Amino acid sequence: MAVTTSCTGSAPGNGGVAAGKPGTAGVGDRLFPGLGNGGYDVVHYGLTLDYVPETNHLKGTAIITAQATQDLSRFNLDLSGLRLRSTTVQGAKAQVARAGDELLVTPAKTVRNREVFKTVVTYDGTPRTLKDDDGGLEGWMETDDGSTALGQPSGSMTWFPGNHHPSDKATYDTTVTVPKDEDGDPYDVISNGKLITEEDKGKTVTRHWRTEEPMASYLAHVSIGYFETHKGRTDDDVPVYVAIDPDEAEDSADVPDLVPEIVDWASKLFGPYPFSSAGAIVDHLPGLDYALETQTKPYFGEAPEEALLVHELAHQWFGNSVTPREWKDLWLSEGLATYAEWLWEEERGDRGTTEIFEDYYDGTDTESEGIWAFPPADPPGAGRVSDPPVYGRGAMVVHKVRRAVGDETFFDILRTWTRQHRHGNVDTRQFIALCESKSGKDLSALFNTWLFDEKKPSRM
């Protein structure tokens, strides 16, 4: 791998540097070994962006507040493309080298273990769209009236530097300035969390959004374009912000009412809604073959079916608030969100969850194709992490737990899971332990058969 050095400061002196050691490049994720970085935990991202839709040019300043987990002589940040303009650590110029999508940052002085330190990176350029391991598109994508940024699993590094792995969650302030269009009309700028300020400066509009709860970087999001906005509140007084592209308005007419209805319904089953705002973004991005549970406002490239809306909103509990520590445990997000779809269908008086389970087992459900390709908790590679076993068979595991422990214990398990691990990271072992603790049963045979076994289980 070629390494090039950028001119962002003089090499540090010997004093203080030798006492520390470099943080690791990557956090040891089996499926994505290059994602994330060791040696520090990010506390907060302050992102200030200037974007010109007509030229797709982005200029950014990232203020990254982190706490060292060791004495750091050097640490890495993930950034794909974009020109690096300057980097400081604790106000002093840092030396930076680039190795692919890694920034190797050497501060002027060693950062001491447990020290809270601030890194400021300025950058600009044309942000990239990436093709991930399963062939899907992510990163910064142009739309017919602006752009959008989608991050799973690593696309967020195309528009801001950071520690891009779900095990390192942080709060965010995202401020975006966009010039008005040629007719003098403002673009809408939408991001995660609550809208804090909106400023019309004549030729430009600036919006400042804030996430008050920790967020994995793959859930960070910006959409720029023209939207019809709808505001409301849930029964628990959570503010709801729904933005719909005019091209999708007719087919999305029920979305503004469905979002608070689904959030209220899910809160009764899974526990209190975990964030201080809710909503959805329905954009017009033909060719995008997925939706994404971007935190507080799931993103859809077209008008969503009701079941898909349920799925992405359920992720606010399972995946966004309670986040897998490694990508191999993604079934904890996707299996539970898929099961939420089943519960919603049951609530609506259509198929019951047992009937859906049987349809999946028999292969008669349209979503059941390929679910026996591998165990849900053991995807064979990065390109398979979003395959049907993680979703459909993952939901079947959840249903088998429900049948084994009974409804009262099952929903107690779900509410305890979201309460105990609120805004944290989890793994499969913890979920199994909770199921066994709450039920008082040895469930090893169930999990070995349905979650870990390579073969399609016999009908039981």
Regions found by a protein language model. Give the residues of each.
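N-terminal, polar/Ser/Thr-rich
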Residues: 3-59, 142-145, 166
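A surface-exposed beta-strand-loop module
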Residues: 79-141
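Hydrophobic helix-coil surface modules that form long, contiguous segments used
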Residues: 60, 165-310, 339
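Surface-exposed beta-strand/loop patches in extracellular or lumenal glycoproteins
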Residues: 61-82, 160-164, 171-179, 429
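Beta-strand-rich interaction surfaces with strong enrichment in secreted/lumenal proteins
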Residues: 48-49, 93-94, 106-111, 159-164, ...
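Glycine/proline-rich low-complexity spacer/linker segments in large multi-domain proteins
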Residues: 113, 123-172
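Zinc-dependent metallopeptidase catalytic helix centered on the HExxH motif
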Residues: 295-359
